[in-house]
């Protein structure tokens, strides 16, 4: 789970605390060659304060220290706020890739769907 991921990638992830609450977080790691930002989020009431950018800079610096040269992330196409953010801070949308999923354990996915 998340604990194992954090243990494999020490010092890479970040949680922003504002007013004693978690305002945002990034789960960050790498495979030795490419870094990846997972589950990037900033609570709506804390957006437009530079928190997201500061967290990205933290993660990018941690990856640079680990000699990682490229970083990727996945953003849903319908996430207009997130996609505008990535474009605004200079990330490039790749047009040359297709993204594929294969579900190994449906229970693992649906148990988090708390609708």
Predicted features, each with a name:
Residues 1-39, 58, 62, 66, ...:
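Acetyl-CoA-dependent GNAT
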Residues 30, 43-49, 77-78:
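Active-site acidic-Proline motif in GNAT/NAT acetyltransferases
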Residues 39-42, 48-61, 84, 88:
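Conserved acetyl-CoA-binding loop-helix of GNAT-fold acetyltransferases
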Residues 56, 63-76:
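Conserved GNAT acetyl-CoA-binding A-motif
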Residues 73-82, 101-104:
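Conserved beta-strand-loop-alpha-helix junction that forms the acyl-donor binding cleft
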Residues 87-96:
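Conserved acetyl-CoA-binding loop of GNAT-fold acetyltransferases
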Residues 87-88, 109-111:
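Short low-complexity, flexible loop/linker segments enriched in glycine and/or proline
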